[in-house]
Amino acid sequence: MYCLFCQHTYTRVIDSRVSEDGATIRRRRECEACGERFSTLETIELKLPVIIKKDGGREAFDGRKLRTSFDRALQKRPVAEECIEMALRAVIHRLRMAGEREVPSIVVGEYVMAELRKLDHVGYVRFASVYRSFQDVADFREEIEKLESELLVSREQLPLLEAAMESMGHPSVDQGGKHGV
């Protein structure tokens, strides 16, 4: 790092401290040329990737567009604001953790659909109908049948899960209405 006083190209770190929230490191530095001391603050830079659109164009990630997608899909649906915020954060987290500089918009769309599927099936189908360009009622029917099939599998697995929990000494859902985990 350059010295702020003499512009010498090398300074050494003489002390480092992490902030209380753990997001910043304060470093005390000393210039090897002039001996002046100064402090720097380092923070993590978590850039979101550039989005590659279907037409090949590129644009910076826009959280407002992501929010609009969720809002449109969930319009007039009984989904708590906190749940929507958590879903938004989950999509953004997945984008950051991908570690890519560029991500195709199709990937973002799949992340959104995964979150909507957990939040609200009507919102999921709304989003999927636009995102996947449904052409007719058959496309809607096919998507709804997939959802129903997934729900059926989940319902069939619940008794198996409860039996496994009971065999490990955990009470079932029927005992007190809550999992005893």
UniProtKB/Swiss-Prot annotation:
User: What is written in the cofactor note of this entry?
Assistant: Binds 1 zinc ion.
Q: Which Pfam families match?
A: ATP-cone, Zn_ribbon_NrdR
Looking at the keywords, is Zinc present?
A: yes
Which UniProt key words apply to this protein?
Answer: ATP-binding, DNA-binding, Metal-binding, Nucleotide-binding, Repressor, Transcription, Transcription regulation, Zinc, Zinc-finger
unnamed zinc fingers: which residues? 3-34
Q: Does the keyword Transcription apply?
A: yes
Query: Which cofactor names does the annotation list?
Result: Zn(2+)
GO BP terms:
negative regulation of DNA-templated transcription
ATP-cone domain residues = 49-139
One annotated GO molecular function is:
ATP binding
Which domain of life does this protein belong to? Answer: Bacteria
> InterPro entries under this entry?
ATP-cone_dom, NrdR-like_N, RNR_NrdR-like
What does the UniProt function comment say about this protein?
Negatively regulates transcription of bacterial ribonucleotide reductase nrd genes and operons by binding to NrdR-boxes.
- Please give the family membership noted in the entry: Belongs to the NrdR family.
Name listed for the protein in its UniProt record: Transcriptional repressor NrdR
The organism that produces this protein has a lineage beginning with: Bacteria, Pseudomonadati, Pseudomonadota, Gammaproteobacteria, Lysobacterales
